[in-house]
Structures are given as structure tokens and as C-alpha cells.
């Protein structure tokens, strides 16, 4: 997790860093013939790059606001299931740094109708690539399952989207807080581990939502409470703040009734603020 964060910060620094001034050569070492000037090519706007990606897909939206994207690929009898929530570390209020990532961990430790480890039933049916991640702008959860086990994956994802809080306990919060803090210690003590913080502070001004790293501070993690978990879930984990992506051995005609069956009863949450 921390390695992914470090790679992302490094890439962000390359994108945002101003162009370096051209190196100058002392007159005594200058060549007698001047080199031909080079014209730098401006990068294409992100909107153009996104538009150039042509991946056939269908999409629809449930009445509760859940957006669904379906891409059909029949090469193998598997379906990749991915849920993207439009919330990340940029949404953390002052004094709550690291909470988006801490909450991601809690999502794997039981929901109201499956109060057990999220991974256990997936492993029993041969799922692969089951994991999650947190970044500035989003938190995502994903797994690839046999087509015959798609119902199970949708049930598990929908239960933690709509029915999580009844399974959250102080003991679970304390356990995952410890796990996240150990991740932080491991990252901080790795070579150049503290460089991440300096890079973000150098790139973004005080008060910018990207200025603090996703792992958060020890003090803020220690202060996280079950009440904070409830507030974060209610504010950010409604279906209207998420996108469900199904890719593989499935089509939109099959997906619509399945998604409605499992996600249709999840109530919409408030409309979160958007940073532009």
C-alpha cells in the first residue's frame, strides 16, 4: 500500500514540477558551434487522452444514484468486480488525516449480513485479485470471480455499501488502527520514507486538500472513534457517490437485474462536496 503511495507521489511531482531552466556552459568550455535549438512538445490535454481510449461499454444508473459500467469480454468465464467511491484523503477534515485509508481497512472486517472476513467466501470460490486502495480522490475495492460466483461478489459488495455500521465494533476499529499504524511505521522507516511528506508539502500550499499524505498522522489515527466511522460512512459511502464496474463474462442485459437485486435497497446518501 505505502509503495503504491510513494510511486503515485513521485509521478505527481513529475507532472506538477515546473520546467527546469536550461543548463548553461561556462564560456571557456563552450563549443565553437551552437547546438540547434530544440522545441519541446506540449503534452496533450487529459481530456484528449481520455477521449482517445475506445473501450466498448454500456452504462446505467439505479434510482438510488449508483452508476454502473459494464464491459463484455468473453475470453474467460470470469468477471472483474470493482466499486469506486468518490472519496479519499482530500475529503478528510482537519484532525482526521488517515481516516479514509483506515476506513478502507474496516470495510474488509464484516457487514451486517456477513459479519466475518470479506476475503473468506471469495477465497472459497476461487476469486483472485481481491484488494482495495485509497488515494487523494477515491477509494476502491475489487476482486475477480468466476462467472458462477458473481452473485456472491455482488452480495458482499452491496452489503458493505448499504449495511456496514451494525457490524462495526470498537474492537475492530482498534485492531485496524494498529494495522494502519504499523503500515505507517514501516513506510516511514523505509529508505526515503519521509520524503513523501516533504514532496507533498513542497508541491501544495498550506490548506490544500492534497498537502497531507493518505496514511495520516499517528495522533489523528489514535483519535479516530467509532462515531467517526459512522459519520464517514453516512457522508461518503452512499450509492450516489459510487461507481460499480463489471468487466468480463457479462453483458448489460444480465447485469441490470442482478445489480438492482443486490444494490437497489441501499439508500442514497447526501451529495458530497466536490473539489474543483
Model-derived segments and spans:
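Structural beta-strand/beta-sheet cores of well-ordered domains, especially the beta-sheet scaffolds
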Residues: 5, 58, 79-81, 104, ...
Amino acid at each position: 500500500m505505502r509503495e503504491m503511495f510513494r510511486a503515485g507521489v513521485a509521478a505527481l511531482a513529475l507532472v506538477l514540477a515546473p520546467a527546469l531552466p536550461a543548463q548553461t556552459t561556462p564560456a571557456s568550455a563552450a563549443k565553437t558551434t551552437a547546438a540547434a535549438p530544440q522545441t519541446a512538445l506540449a503534452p496533450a490535454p487529459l481530456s484528449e487522452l481520455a477521449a482517445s481510449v475506445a473501450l466498448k461499454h454500456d452504462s446505467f444508473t439505479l434510482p438510488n444514484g449508483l452508476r454502473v459500467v459494464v464491459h463484455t469480454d468473453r475470453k474467460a468465464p470470469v468477471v472483474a468486480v470493482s466499486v469506486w467511491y468518490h472519496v479519499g484523503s482530500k475529503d478528510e477534515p482537519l484532525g482526521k488525516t488517515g481516516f479514509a485509508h483506515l476506513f478502507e481497512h474496516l470495510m474488509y472486517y464484516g457487514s451486517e449480513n456477513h459479519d466475518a472476513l470479506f476475503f473468506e467466501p471469495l477465497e472459497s470460490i476461487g476469486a483472485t485479485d481481491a484488494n482495495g486502495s485509497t488515494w487523494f480522490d477515491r477509494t476502491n475495492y475489487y476482486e475477480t470471480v468466476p462467472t458462477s460466483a458473481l452473485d456472491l461478489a455482488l452480495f458482499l459488495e452491496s452489503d458493505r455499501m448499504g449495511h456496514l455500521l451494525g457490524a462495526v465494533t470498537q474492537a475492530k476499529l482498534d485492531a485496524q488502527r494498529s494495522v494502519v499504524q504499523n503500515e505507517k511505521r514501516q513506510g516511514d522507516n523505509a529508505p526515503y520514507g519521509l520524503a513523501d511528506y516533504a514532496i507533498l508539502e513542497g508541491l501544495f500550499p498550506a490548506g490544500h486538500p492534497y498537502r497531507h499524505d493518505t496514511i495520516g498522522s499517528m495522533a489523528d489515527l489514535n483519535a479516530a472513534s467509532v462515531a467517526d466511522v459512522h459519520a464517514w460512512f453516512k457522508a461518503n459511502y452512499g450509492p450516489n457517490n459510487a461507481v460499480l464496474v463489471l468487466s468480463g463474462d457479462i453483458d448489460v442485459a444480465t447485469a441490470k437485474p442482478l445489480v438492482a437485486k443486490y444494490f437497489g435497497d441501499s439508500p442514497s446518501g447526501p451529495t458530497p462536496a466536490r473539489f474543483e
